[in-house]
């Protein structure tokens, strides 16, 4: 419907005044908002990137990853850091649990020499550090491990047994209000790792809940529920975990999708195993009996051997990864995905060796 000419002039003057006072981009028409094409960072898992719909976790947003103990929460966030660092981004890890293992992080591909790390004494200190890093505009990814370990100062200074009802929830609620706008302006991804607790007296429905109150649930653009659903074995030896991630909330694409992948001990997410499974599913890899073939060439007998072939031939893995992303991700813009870039780097290194 056409707007009256006088109203158009008044609106244009108002928009000009708002932009002059608060800066360009402070108000715009939704259809012109370029930020709708959200920049993402790969999770390190191709199937999870596809389940998220946008190719990874969104920049400038808050993400919550929660699940039981030893389900792969920290491993997943370290894979995100490794993917971000390969793109030249600056990352920070707020280790409230004081449990980060730098040797394990290095095995997953994290550049620990350039990873900012803080082990705060109180929850308020941790969140103030997050805010300071965000406002600097120089940090691209911040991980907080974990919400449950963000202990309010009053609780630390008090005695064991003292009642501190709702302190952590109030602290998180205030922090979310302060951080959300700054993260958008700085285009910084903030990931909170969270733990699960049981609600007492729940007869029907799911008794599980996350710590830190409800504010994080509302402010998070993406919430991921990660679970260990089985073991990966070589003979009788357990070498990893079968993992399922459910996208419980998603503001950038359709929610409730699931991804399943393997986390191998000391190696992280088995991306080559994912490429084999997805390649077979979408008919890019042929499977005849136990043999796997790609482009007419046999690449291995059994999934493990096919995965090893892709590991030893990163150029082939990069090509397969690119084809799968172009086929399965919506709104492809022709740019090289993060994971493909990582494979390409390995391919370059391999060609230099020979």
Swiss-Prot record:
Cystine pairings recorded for this chain: none
Keyword DNA-binding carried by entry: yes
Task: Enumerate the UniProt keywords alphabetically.
Answer: ATP-binding, Cytoplasm, DNA damage, DNA recombination, DNA repair, DNA-binding, Nucleotide-binding, SOS response
Single Gene Ontology BP annotation: DNA repair
Q: Which Pfam families match?
A: RecA (PF00154), RecA_C (PF21096)
Molecular function GO terms recorded:
ATP binding; ATP hydrolysis activity; ATP-dependent DNA damage sensor activity; damaged DNA binding; single-stranded DNA binding
According to its UniProt record, where is this protein located?
Cytoplasm
| Protein origin, superkingdom | Bacteria
One GO cellular component term: cytosol
| Binding positions (ATP) | 67-74
What the entry lists under InterPro entries is as follows: AAA+_ATPase, DNA_recomb/repair_RecA, DNA_recomb/repair_RecA_CS, P-loop_NTPase, RecA-like_C, RecA-like_N, RecA_ATP-bd, RecA_C_sf
Q: What does this protein do?
A: Can catalyze the hydrolysis of ATP in the presence of single-stranded DNA, the ATP-dependent uptake of single-stranded DNA by duplex DNA, and the ATP-dependent hybridization of homologous single-stranded DNAs. It interacts with LexA causing its activation and leading to its autocatalytic cleavage.
The cross-references to HAMAP family, in alphabetical order and at most eight, read:
RecA (MF_00268)
Q: Which NCBIfam families match?
A: tigrfam_recA
Return the similarity comment: Belongs to the RecA family.
Under what name is this protein listed? Answer: Protein RecA
User: What species is this protein from?
Assistant: Yersinia enterocolitica serotype O:8 / biotype 1B (strain NCTC 13174 / 8081)
